């Protein structure tokens, strides 16, 4: 689901390249849209690709540093928390939410996840290191965090949040 027709249009060729066939993008008006309400408690997995400052992409988009401010990041964190809360309602017991951004800011990543876990004690943080190890990928830490200077990629963050069965 997304509120942006442009992002949904951009998603279609990316899905085709990925080989995924079980993804059905759909437009919604907001995180309380009736399409989402119908799925409450029924979904196995939700990926929250949260709108963010994009500061993890500075090496490709250096002008971003001039377009972001403390106020704009503060506005984004409110939106991120609301979207993550809405995603949590979709997941069945035993299901999973993955929260991801292309930001390096603690305010958009760790702080959002930590506040979410306080608001939603029915969820636990599953260490990314364990999930990645099952795929043969060595990684330390509770979160997946890609850093441009270490991994030669854009900056990226992901947290795995499992709903207790």
Regions found by a protein language model. Name each.
Residues 1-165:
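S-adenosylmethionine
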């Amino acid at each position: 689901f997304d509120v942006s027709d442009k992002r949904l249009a951009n998603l279609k060729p990316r899905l085709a390249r990925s080989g995924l066939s079980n993804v059905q993008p759909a437009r919604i008006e907001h995180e309380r849209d009736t399409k989402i309400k119908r799925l409450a408690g029924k979904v196995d997995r939700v990926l929250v690709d949260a709108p963010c400052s994009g500061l993890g992409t500075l090496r490709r988009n250096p002008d971003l540093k001039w377009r972001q401010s403390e106020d704009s990041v503060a506005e984004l964190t409110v939106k991120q928390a609301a979207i993550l809360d809405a995603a949590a309602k979709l997941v069945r017991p035993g299901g999973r939410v993955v929260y991801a951004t292309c930001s390096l800011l603690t305010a958009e990543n760790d702080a959002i996840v930590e506040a979410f876990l306080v608001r939603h004690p029915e969820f636990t943080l599953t260490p990314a290191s364990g999930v990645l190890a099952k795929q043969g990928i060595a990684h330390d830490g509770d979160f997946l965090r890609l850093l441009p200077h270490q991994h030669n990629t854009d900056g990226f963050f992901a947290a795995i949040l499992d709903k207790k069965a």
